[in-house]
Each structure stands twice: as C-alpha cells, then as structure tokens.
UniProtKB/Swiss-Prot annotation:
This is Shiftless antiviral inhibitor of ribosomal frameshifting protein homolog. One of its GO terms (biological process) is negative regulation of translational frameshifting. A motif (Nuclear localization signal) lies at residues 140-156. Inhibits programmed -1 ribosomal frameshifting (-1PRF) of a variety of mRNAs from viruses and cellular genes. Interacts with the -1PRF signal of target mRNA and translating ribosomes and causes premature translation termination at the frameshifting site. May exhibit antiviral activity. The keyword Cell inner membrane does not apply.
Length: 304
C-alpha cells in the first residue's frame, strides 16, 4: 500500500475514534490538527483538550492544516462521508421501512428480531441434509428462517432431513442406570445401554465435530432388523444406521433423503460462513473453517 494512503487510513481511523469519544462535539478540523500534532495518541490529545483548549485555538488549527495535504484529504473524505450519512435518513424507502417496523406488535418474536438485528446476529442451527440421487449426506449450519442447503455433487437444493428421521452419531441417556453414551443410531430407534442393556432412544443426533469426546471400544448394537449385531427382540422393518450394517446389506448411505427445496423467493442467504461445519470424513481430523461435513463414516466399531 502507498505510504500516503496508509498514513491517511491510519489518521482517518484515529480521528473517527477520537471524535466518537466526545460524541462529535470536537470540530473535524480541530480533531485532525490535534491527531497530527500528537501522532494519533489519544491520551495526549484528550489531555490537550482538557488543559490547553482556548478560544484562540481555532485560528492556530486552520494555519496548521493549510500546508498538510494528508490532513486536508482526510478532512475532505470525512466531510463527504458525514454528508452522505446526513442524507441517508431522508431516503423515502428507509423512512417507510422504519415506520412499518414501529407499527409491529411488541411480541417476544419481534423483540428477538430487533435485538438480533441490532447485534448483527443471524440465529442458526446445524442441520443434516441427504441427497438420495447422489447417495450423499452432509451437515450444514443454516439460518433458522431458511433451512436449505445445496448438494455440491448435483447442485440441487434440499430441505433438511426431518428431525424425527435424523441418523448418525447419537447421544443416549439411560433412565435406568443414568449413564450417558454415544454411538451410531437414529431417532426413534432404540439401542441397548452398554451397561444395563436397557433399550434407550437417542436424545439427539450430533453434528460431526472435532474432539467429540473419547472413543469407546463398545460394539454397536440396536433393535433394527438388519443390524449386523442385532439384538432380540428386534423390530421388523427398522433400518440400522451403522455404516457396517449398510455395507453388509448393500444399502445406500442415505436412510431418509431430504425433500427438494421449493424456493419462496426469499433473499436471505442459505448458508453461514462463520462457525460452519466441516467437509471431510467424520472419523478424520477435520478443519474448523470449512463449511460442511460430508458424513462418510468408516465401518470401525470403536465409536459404538
């Protein structure tokens, strides 16, 4: 970056922060002159204002700025930005929108919307998606208002897998022995507790994450009819979620495909880049800054 441009950028940032400290009560020219004089040192500038400011300063300030091209460029830019800011609220569309917002009932939902907007926050959830055509399963962090993701193999958009049909690494809480355990499973399909053998329904399906906890050597088992380690009694028609059972029975990875997404014309972004899930094998060491996770599990028994 050019030296003068970098100098102007640093000066502009310092001036804007400095004027904000005093709620804009310091004139722009005075702020620029002081920041130039004290090399952007806020403490010294504040002391100067408190101890040394008098009625003759304005004339001295203008004289200081006449031969300072960097300062003049910053003054002109900030003045231009300030003028744009003053003109913006006059926009009829903005006024109409603000008026409509003011007429909304103060419900809990609307209050949360205003609070989220004020804090530049988009509520999101981690959801599972599955493309039947590509036999591809992935997780995506999506806005709650528009839960949709695109299969990056066929490029078609899908709604998430229904919450009562999700499968993958499940978390179980046994009501008998009070033990919590994890293993491959699916919602509404019981697996026996590894300690007391009591059938337990999963409380949730976990998105793939790094460091999901210690791995166990317990062998997977569930009440599905085609489980490779089936327990008796089993439930006819239930499908086992474990990859080993899927491979042994020559079944696709996708247990319950996502429905194709029908667009409503919303302009809200369908994916969030911050804090998104990763795209890799679920059993691998995975990176935190990639957006998706392909659920392509191995057939190792060690994770339940």
């Amino acid at each position: 970056m050019d030296g003068n441009v970098q100098e102007e950028l640093e000066l502009e940032k310092s001036i804007r922060r400095f004027r904000e400290k005093f709620h804009g009560k310091v004139t722009l020219e005075t702020a620029v002159a002081l920041m130039r004089r004290f090399t952007n040192n806020h403490d010294q500038v504040c002391k100067y204002i408190i101890l040394c400011m008098d009625n003759d300063t304005d004339l001295d300030v203008r004289n200081d700025l006449r031969n300072d091209p960097v300062a003049r460029n910053v003054i002109n830019k900030i003045k231009s930005d300030d003028q744009k800011a003053k003109e913006m609220p006059k926009d009829k569309d903005i006024k109409d929108l603000a008026k409509r917002m003011n007429t909304l009932p103060l419900t809990e939902k609307n209050l949360k919307m205003f609070n989220d907007a004020a804090e530049n926050r988009i509520p999101s959830r981690d959801r599972q998606f599955a493309c039947k055509e590509c036999d591809f399963v992935w997780w995506r962090r999506v806005p709650q208002r528009k839960e949709v993701s695109r299969c990056h193999r066929c490029r078609k958009k899908f709604d998430p897998v229904p919450e009562n049909k999700m499968w993958g690494i499940a978390e179980y809480h046994c009501p008998v022995c009070r033990r919590m355990f994890r293993g491959f499973g699916q919602i509404e399909v019981s697996s026996p507790c590894y300690v007391c053998r009591n059938p337990v329904l999963p409380s949730c399906i976990l998105p793939p994450r790094r460091n999901q906890g210690p791995r166990t050597r317990n062998t997977h088992s569930c009440l599905a009819e085609n489980c490779y380690n089936r327990r008796v009694p089993f439930v006819a028609g239930l499908q086992c979620a474990h990859p080993k059972s899927r491979i042994m029975n020559q079944l696709p990875k996708v247990l319950h495909p996502s429905e194709p997404h029908i667009s409503t014309g919303s302009t809200i972004a369908t994916c969030l880049s911050q804090g998104s899930l990763t795209e890799n094998d679920i059993d691998d060491i995975i990176l935190d800054d990639i957006k998706e996770e392909e659920e392509d599990e191995g057939s190792d028994d060690s994770d339940g």
